[in-house]
From Swiss-Prot:
Residues 37-52 have a biased composition (Basic and acidic residues). GO terms for biological process: translation. Keywords: Ribonucleoprotein, Ribosomal protein. The gene is rpsU. InterPro entries: Ribosomal_bS21 (IPR001911), Ribosomal_bS21_CS (IPR018278), Ribosomal_bS21_sf (IPR038380). GO terms for cellular component: ribonucleoprotein complex; ribosome. GO terms for molecular function: structural constituent of ribosome. It comes from Afipia carboxidovorans (strain ATCC 49405 / DSM 1227 / KCTC 32145 / OM5). Residues 53-62 have a biased composition (Basic residues). Belongs to the bacterial ribosomal protein bS21 family. This is Small ribosomal subunit protein bS21. NCBIfam families: S21p.
Length: 96
């Protein structure tokens, strides 16, 4: 894998290299190969990953078709759903 270093900017080249390695899945593979994985464990992990992918695809498809609401966007700002008061909100907590 190669990355060009422009104007002796090593930080930018390292950032580009890290991004390429992330896209290629090298970090994930290094993590998996860090220890021995029994064939039965590998098979179970791969099966679980496939199930997760299938569920994610099905969920995305339902969201596109409008049958499933998409995740609500996070609210940034002062209010954040605390009501009009903006404080702790609600009734005071009972003493223990």
């Amino acid at each position: 894998m190669q990355v060009l270093v422009r104007d002796n900017n090593v930080d930018q080249a390292l950032k580009a290299l890290k991004k390429k390695m992330q896209r290629e899945g090298i970090f994930r593979e290094m993590k998996l190969r860090g220890h021995y994985e029994k064939p039965s464990e590998k098979k179970a992990r791969e099966k679980a990953e496939a199930v997760r992918r299938a569920r994610k695809l099905a969920r995305k498809k339902l969201q596109r078709e409008g049958l499933l609401p998409s995740k609500p966007k996070p609210v940034f700002g002062a209010d954040r759903g605390r009501g009009a008061a903006g404080g702790a909100g609600g009734a005071p907590r009972p003493a223990r």
